[in-house]
Amino acid sequence: MNLGLIKMMNKDYNGAREAFGSAANAEGINEAMGVYYLRQGDYQTAAKAFGDSKSNNAALAQILNKDYSAAQSTLEAVRAPNATTYYMMAVVAARTNNEQAVYANLRKAAALDASIKDRAAIDKEFANYNVANL
């Protein structure tokens, strides 16, 4: 599986797929395949590959499939949420018109990573929100 991850990092997607196929029963293979399909732009297959995984990547696949309820549940279940987790929760909140959650999650993200403020200020996801004063 590690060979597949290295090949994927080097944008050798055919080689990555072959290596992942050889590691079909390896721990973490579903997560790796999910990332593979995300990079290929096959978001539906990515979401299926992640299965019940509770990770930022799994939530990203769900967001890109417009399954915001599943993405919210996944993000809430992430074991060690980080700035990206909260930023993604803010994206879900923006896409579901939950203004209070947008601000609450962006504040949590910015508390963990101050650069989030600058990112949110130019992110079209938050164009309808005043994120300048996080």
Where is each model-derived feature located?
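Terminal, low-structured helical/coil segments at or just beyond the last alpha-helical repeat
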Residues: 103-134
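Canonical tetratricopeptide repeat
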Residues: 2, 32, 57, 88, ...
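Start-of-helix register in tetratricopeptide repeats
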Residues: 28-32, 53, 60, 84, ...
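Residue-level recognition of tetratricopeptide repeat
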Residues: 5, 35, 59-60, 91
